[in-house]
Amino acid sequence: MKMKKLNIYIIGLLTLMLCGIQSCALESEVFDEITPSIYPQTERDVRDLVTGNAYSPFQNYDYGGLYNVANGVMLISDMATEYGFCSWGGWIWEPLEFARWTPSDEDRIAYPWTNYLKGISKMTLTIDRITNVNMNKDLLNQYIAELRCARGFLAFLLYDLYGPIIVADLETLKNAEDEIILPRLSEEETHNFIVTEPVSYTHLRAH
């Protein structure tokens, strides 16, 4: 009789445990990536995100950055117009000095385009991601204006070297897996983008 009661007790206990396990909703936590749902959340997050995406292209670090000494925008512009030359000798800079570049020289000639055109898209996504963060609205508007000004200035630098640029809209950027090939803007569209983007920043500074 005692064994029977013990068996019933054990079976009942196991049943309760199994019910508890089945009713437990497991939610996974992602630790290896940062998504818009978890970042940015605070004013500090926004500041860091804006600093990283609005200002990082305009720097010089060794052979990186738009203003680097080896193949930045200033060096390419100066050498292509005979205003400057490279004291290191011909080598990869010779095509610029003598306007004799070929497809094989693309890596150096197109460095700002291939490495920093995407910066415009990063700034567009950053504007979208910070817009609804709960923070001081005046400061938020300032950050958005800084991003737009940076977009306009980056577009100007690239247009000066390569002509009309490619600007992806937000919907395309949010559906990057569709792999849509975008055309360049027209001359007029590029001009308008360059002129109107910094306006928000200058207007904010004036007030």
Residue ranges and their predicted role:
Residues 1-32:
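Bacterial Sec-dependent N-terminal signal peptides
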Residues 24-146, 150-192:
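Short acidic-aromatic linear motifs embedded in glycine-rich loops, typified by GG[WY][YF]DAGD(H)
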Residues 198-199:
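Acidic, proline/serine/threonine- and glycine-rich low-complexity intrinsically disordered segments
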Residues 202-207:
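Conserved small/polar residues in nucleotide/adenosyl-binding loops
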